[in-house]
Amino acid sequence: MPLKETTGKVVSDKMNKTIVVAVENRISHRKYAKTMIRTKKYKAHDENNECTIGDIVTIQETRPLSRTKCWTMVNILSKSFDN
């Protein structure tokens, strides 16, 4: 079974070796057919602490690393230039 991969934006990097990634998902309302954006936050493992807030990253599902962390950062697609 292939591992799940998804892309999102880093919204927090305050924890050591952990980032919080917000993943947006566009869905259509069943009754009204309006396109809505649902956002889900995932905690992901960042071994080298190389991500900053605003980066676009790819995360991959892995074994549970802690109570809330079961994703790992694969690569950084684009860096944030706010700093």
Curated annotation (Swiss-Prot):
InterPro entries per UniProt: NA-bd_OB-fold, Ribosomal_uS17, Ribosomal_uS17_bact/chlr, Ribosomal_uS17_CS
Biological-process GO terms, alphabetical: translation
Any one GO CC term of the record: chloroplast
Keyword annotations from UniProtKB, A to Z: Chloroplast, Plastid, Ribonucleoprotein, Ribosomal protein, RNA-binding, rRNA-binding
Pfam families: Ribosomal_S17 (PF00366)
MF (Gene Ontology): rRNA binding; structural constituent of ribosome
Stored SUPFAM superfamilies: Nucleic acid-binding proteins (SSF50249)
Family matches, as Gene3D superfamilies: Nucleic acid-binding proteins (2.40.50.140)
Localization of this protein: Plastid, Chloroplast
PROSITE patterns (UniProt xref): RIBOSOMAL_S17
Superkingdom of origin: Eukaryota
CDD domains for this protein: Ribosomal_uS17
Task performed by this protein: One of the primary rRNA binding proteins, it binds specifically to the 5'-end of 16S ribosomal RNA.
Subunit structure: Part of the 30S ribosomal subunit.
Family: Belongs to the universal ribosomal protein uS17 family.
Designated name of the protein: Small ribosomal subunit protein uS17c
Organism: Pyropia yezoensis (Susabi-nori)
Gene name tied to this protein: rps17
